[in-house]
Amino acid sequence: MNCLIAIALSVSFFLVGIVGPIQAQLQMNFYANSCPNAEKIVQDFVSNHVSNAPSLAAALIRMHFHDCFVRGCDGSVLINSTSGNAERDATPNLTVRGFGFIDAIKSVLEAQCPGIVSCADIIALASRDAVVFTGGPNWSVPTGRRDGRISNAAEALANIPPPTSNITNLQTLFANQGLDLKDLVLLSGAHTIGVSHCSSFTNRLYNFTGRGGQDPALDSEYAANLKSRKCPSLNDNKTIVEMDPGSRKTFDLSYYQLVLKRRGLFQSDSALTTNPTTLSNINRILTGSVGSFFSEFAKSMEKMGRINVKTGSAGVVRRQCSVANS
């Protein structure tokens, strides 16, 4: 009898161990009872502003990406630091935009449901909604993320793929987050609505080898155009260039066509053609429909949105997205 009781207790504790994490997972409509209008508030706010800010979708999806790649999707990219060592102070995040936009959404939500909706969930929802309102793909965003307490510039520098990445570096950094080469190609497709400062790629135009010279992987005609019309010097850090010229406002397949023509703006774009798996994925996407691409892109976004999420007591809900709870 004692043996049976011991076994029963063991099973009971085992089940508690299983049920706990399951209950802590993300779920659709997480705020249905605690803040029923949360997702509509985010959606309406995005809808009211995206028409006046066509680059908003690209800015928010980039913020979501940069947030998830450092300590998971926990809103830590939003935290300000008086000492200048938070994630947003790291070089990859100096050109990230949308912080004020997320703060504004948070203020509306706090007025409706104080201390309920996390900043991490706001980023995930707003980035999806902004892309949808520009005619891009839709994807499921389960909620229940908690916000992180730590934001470290060095970690951002170590984990966010720079635009100078080769395929080996990209594969490693994506694998570190549980993403594969297919995800890399699909998520890179967001560059179709992206923009970049000249400083992110002028080394390809003026000093690729460190002793001057141009990146041979970049189409020479395209490079000449960039030099003469967009980025006249190596040190231009103000001019903004479309990553998918002429099609930036349309979420489509043209980015991949440019990559195959050696007209991807970043080295990391060109790198996608240097690996048989990534190249095969590009060709497969281009022979398929836009609808198929949207469906696959959605799956990779859903996968990215679950990276190392904090739920339950593992995180907090910040009252101000830019300030870590004391």
UniProtKB/Swiss-Prot annotation:
User: What keyword terms does UniProt attach to this protein?
Assistant: Calcium, Disulfide bond, Glycoprotein, Heme, Hydrogen peroxide, Iron, Metal-binding, Oxidoreductase, Peroxidase, Secreted, Signal
According to UniProt, the tissues expressing it are described as: Expressed in root cells.
Residues recorded as binding Ca(2+) 2, renumbered to this chain, are 192, 244, 247, 252
Q: What is the free-text note on the cofactor?
A: Binds 1 heme b (iron(II)-protoporphyrin IX) group per subunit.
The record ties this protein, via SUPFAM superfamilies, to: Heme-dependent peroxidases (SSF48113)
Catalytic residues (positions):
66
Residues glycosylated per entry: 80, 138, 166, 207, 237
Q: Identify the cofactor(s).
A: heme b; Ca(2+)
GO function terms (MF aspect): heme binding; lactoperoxidase activity; metal ion binding; peroxidase activity
Query: What is an annotated GO biological process for this record, any one?
Result: response to cold
Q: Which residues form the signal peptide?
A: 1-24
The record's induction entry says:
Up-regulated by cold temperatures and down-regulated by light. In response to low temperatures, transcripts accumulate in the whole etiolated seedlings but only in roots of light-grown seedlings.
Instruction: Quote the PROSITE patterns the UniProt record gives.
Output: PEROXIDASE_1 (PS00435), PEROXIDASE_2 (PS00436), PEROXIDASE_4 (PS50873)
Please give the catalytic activity noted in the UniProt record. 2 a phenolic donor + H2O2 = 2 a phenolic radical donor + 2 H2O
Q: Which residues of this UniProt protein bind heme b?
A: 191
Q: What is its EC number?
A: 1.11.1.7
**Where does the chain bind Ca(2+) 1?**
67, 70, 72, 74, 76
S-S bonds: 35-113, 68-73, 119-321, 198-231
| Gene3D superfamilies according to UniProt | 1.10.520.10, Peroxidase, domain 2 (1.10.420.10)
Its predominant location is secreted
Question: What residues does the record give for site: Transition state stabilizer?
Answer: 62
Return the GO cellular component terms, semicolon-separated: endoplasmic reticulum; extracellular region
Where in or outside the cell it occurs: the entry states: Secreted
Return the similarity comment: Belongs to the peroxidase family. Classical plant (class III) peroxidase subfamily.
> Mind telling me what this protein is named?
Peroxidase 3
UniProt gene name? PER3
